[in-house]
Every structure is written in structure tokens, then in C-alpha cells.
């Protein structure tokens, strides 16, 4: 791996090493461009991943304290941890389930198709699905997405078989094991999915696509990547012309460092990216970097979800196989006759015992709750995932009264 000088202002600095940062780093390195990646978390590996939900959460998740306010359910229910994002090399590609779906045509024209929705800040995209299709195809090929490019789908586990039987009985037609960035056959030097059942905890077989062991090692092999784990960025600096000139961060030993740069790419997820841009305010950019619109941090969106679990007569063992093992897409289209904008998809969701209390009946106790836990092997579960509307009031801001350990 390369090691560039702190004063080398010819490098591109990328903040974050996940789906965006890790992939961009490899693309630039392959073209001979020197890159420094600053990642706040530590570097793990398939060998160091832990097949234990609670221990893995401590290993991969971003656990730095958050503060929340307002009446949004997210602020009330998850005040200290409003989003499950990862602080590790590879970012949330270590944790994600691997579902890799394309936007639908109408989702590029939500302002036109949905019309005015009270409280929603809607815009049409400046590009169309047809314009993006070549890039979708390129990404799907690179990631080995199943059911694209002639790549077969993954096998369905018992949880999928339960959902499939019910879906077909109800008349649904588009029911399958999904478009997943998980190898269904050996590919790109990695083996096929071993159906271990701990997709959220990091893939120990390496079958699930993650920049941790795909893009980043390929970038390192070029000699153009300087990856610095446990580097917590605190601000981006600029010169008197308003052009970025460097990044200030704390290294793994807690020492403040400054890396010069000709270009800075911020790829730190939906919370850390706006926080860093706002933290980098200066006399020239009083409202933060790239924020002349005042929109940085606004329009924070999440999943709209609902879940259901049921106990069956015979064992299901839903925890075996991929966490998201199947999907129903018949309801994904926009249908205004239903009385709401956008669509939704139904997916299997196999959760381990450590997470079941939050999904079954939060706060439950006693014999009834114990019965569900005793019958865990007989449970099958699914959830639906819908579209959250962008609202300017749902936003990421800086807390001026509370500081983190970096000040």
C-alpha cells in the first residue's frame, strides 16, 4: 500500500470507504491517480467478522453519541442511535443485505408524477432511467448482481418458501429471490454464498459484495492508494479563492493531522457527510461548504417499513440462508388509486434473537413474550419497504451545546 506525504497536494482525498468512497477510490487508482482514503473506522476482514448479532454491532456500527430533537418518530424512538450506519473500512457495504434494485422510471419524475404533496420537497431528477441504464448495467456486472447479466438467482431458504407460497396464493406474480450483490456462483475470485445467515454481521465467506475486499484491495494493488483507517475527519479547509486545499483529521493515536489535497470527495453517509460540510463553515462560507442553497442536511430520508412475524407448526429456521432471501415486487409501481404516492416491496427479513425484541413487541415481557422466543425456530418473517418523502424539516444539524470526544 502506498504512503503519501501530508504535504502532497496532488492527491485526491476521499472521506469514507463504503459503496461510494471505496468504489471511487478504485476507479481513480486504476487510472493512475493518487488517492488518500480517510476512514473513521477500523479495518476488519471476513476472518475477523463475528457471527453474533450483538458483538458484531459493537464491531461494525457507528456508536458515537447522537443527539436528536423534534416530534419525528425517529427522534423519539431512537434518540441516541437514529440510524444504523457503519464505522469500518467498507462502510455499510459490510452490513447491507445486498439487495440491488434499480429505480423505476416514475421515480426519476416524482414531482411530475406525484404532484404536490403537503410537506414534501419533491423534484424531478435531471436524468432519466434510460440515460442511467448503461451505468446500472456496469454496476450490476461489477458487483455480480444476481438475475442480471446471465447470473443465476440465489436459492430460496425456508423463509422465502413460506413467503412464496403465500404470495402465489394471493395472486402475486413477481416473486423471486431478488437482485442481490451476493455470488450465486464463484465470481471475481470469490466463492458462492454459503448460506451462513449472518449477512448483516459481515459476510465471512466474502460472497457478498463489499468494498472491503473487492474495490479497496484492487485499488491498493495499483500502488496509488493510501488507506488510513481510524482517521476521524473534523473539517475540510479551503484557500482564499474558496477552493479546497486539505482535510484535518485525528489519526488512530488521537493526533491531529492535516492532509493536503487537490480534490476532496465527501462520501461519509447521510449523517456524517452533511455534518462535516456544516462543521467546515468559515468566514467565506458561513453556512458550511456547498451550502449556498441552505439544503445541506435537509430532506433526510429513511425506509418506511412494516413487519410481521408468525409462528408455524413446523420449524422454519429462517435464520439459515441470506437475511433478505426473497422479494415481492407487484406493489412497487405508483398507483394513485391506493391513496398514497409511490409503491412498496415486500421482502423476507430473517432477524436473529438479539434483534427480535425490537420487532416483535417492543417492551414486551412475561409468559407471552417468552413463548415467542421459545418458538423462534418456527418463526417466519417479512417486512414491506416503502418510499419516504423528502421533507426539509427532517434534517441533520449541528448541536451547538454538546461536543463529541474530538471537540
Model-derived segments and spans:
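Conserved beta-strand->loop/alpha-helix structural units within folded catalytic cores of enzymes
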Residues: 16-18, 22-27, 36-38
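Aromatic-residue-lined binding/catalytic grooves and analogous aromatic/hydrophobic interfacial grooves
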Residues: 22, 242, 373
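Conserved redox-cofactor binding core of oxidoreductases
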Residues: 74-76, 112-233
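Redox-cofactor-proximal catalytic regions of oxidoreductases
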Residues: 56-152, 313, 385-405
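Beta1/beta-strand and adjacent pyrophosphate-binding region of the FAD-binding site
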Residues: 4-20
